[in-house]
Amino acid sequence: MQKAYTKVEPTTFDEFTATRDQLERVISRLRSPEASNQRHDELESMIHQEGQELCRLLYQAGLDVRSNEEVKREAVTGHDNVVRTYYREGCERQIESMFGEVIYRRKGYSHPQGECLFPLDEALNMPKRKYTYGLRACISLAVCQNAFDASLEGLSTLIEGKIPKRQAQELVSEVSTDFEAFYAQRAITPVQLPGTVLVMSQDGKGIALRHEDLREATRKAAQQEHHTLCTRLSTGEKRNRKRMATVATVYDVAPHVRSAVDVIGRQGEDGKPSRKDAPKAQNKRVWASIEADMERVTEQIVEESLRRDPKRERPWVMLVDGHKDQIKVIKRVFKRHAIKVPLILDFIHVLEYLWRATWCFFDSKDKEQAQAAEHWVLEKAQAILEGRSGPVAAGIRIKAKRCALSAKKQEVIATVANYLTNHTAMLRYDQFMQQGYPIATGVIEGACRHLIADRFEITGARWSLKTAEGILRLRAIRASGDWDRYQAFHKKQEWKRNHLQRFHGPVLAAE
């Protein structure tokens, strides 16, 4: 459908007249008797308000200069090979910028059989919507860190650009649309950090979604629920509200050879254990997806790793938490890519299992027994770090038989012992540490907290799938330190989508 544009007759004027008038107005106010009696915060507020208008007028003048300099063309050819010879001067368009609304004028070329084309739009890379890329980036950065209402309210005190909440939600998806393309093309020098270990890891974290965006099985289970109370959910009735997002990370780390005692800690002079500081993760990338399934995210992990080390010149390791489905998917993807990577079970998860077992033998309310429980956990943990997970599991079973445990506690002991025996190959910590490999998933645990918990759990809201995915992508870009690079890439892709594809070749770039 042909869009309607206002036709304005061209005029000759000094584009910066209004700008100079505004600047003189500010200077005059600063020199006025009233200003002499103002406090510093009142001056600051006035300058901020009037300065925003000055910036808006400067932006308006800059657009006017480009509009007045635009040269009339005999014809413009679109991608449809239709030659547009009908010419219109001064076609207006409203633009919402960080400084407020401005009016943008340009020449249009049309034909009854094709859409109207504006060559100056391509030269200025004008967005498809009325919101400038600067305003979009500002809004996106704010809402990916805080609730939409709070973010928009906070920004309203800093910038003059206005955008409704619904449009802000839509812009999140639009701004994040080039996420995968950005990382697929990103130039990474192979073996950027020679001698380092390439570490991969993934985990899952639930996000509360709207009913229609839950996975089919979860949605069906939610439909079958019957709530006891009308005004609130009872115990156990908050299930089937979330969809699992898969969180992933790839990073480099210097090898860190250590022993079990180094991890557990040697007794210091103050009676507290002292531990060696581990090297920090470098060149870290974290991301998450709630749209893609676990297998697709695992594929992305491999793709990112191959971009970093295509010839497999460095050691690769995969840190896991022991989830059965996770391990099955990882092994399937690795087999498809014909790569062999040692899977390392997160030592922190192992400690959690040991603590579950210890409270079957000790009373947490008794101080002496609680201290004995801590000693027991450290003793078993050191044995596991020394590569003796099998004997530890056997010892736990023997101790359980000697104690008169309840059926519930016996079930806990069986779970812990089976966990250790079923993952023996992933618990060879003595070998892993000797090779300098990491054995804990601190990076991925931090990513789960930063990407998901710190944003999606602050309001208790149910999210739409599209908006949740957009927020995850934007938070991942920022957490990986790629925000500015991504914004530059996104604007270039927008130019290709909105302008280059509409013309028969890049009209202005060819001249």
Kindly label every feature range from the protein language model.
Residues 1-65, 106-511:
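Catalytic center-proximal scaffold of phosphoryl-transfer enzymes
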Residues 64-128:
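An N-terminal low-complexity regulatory-tail signal and nearby short nucleic-acid-interaction modules
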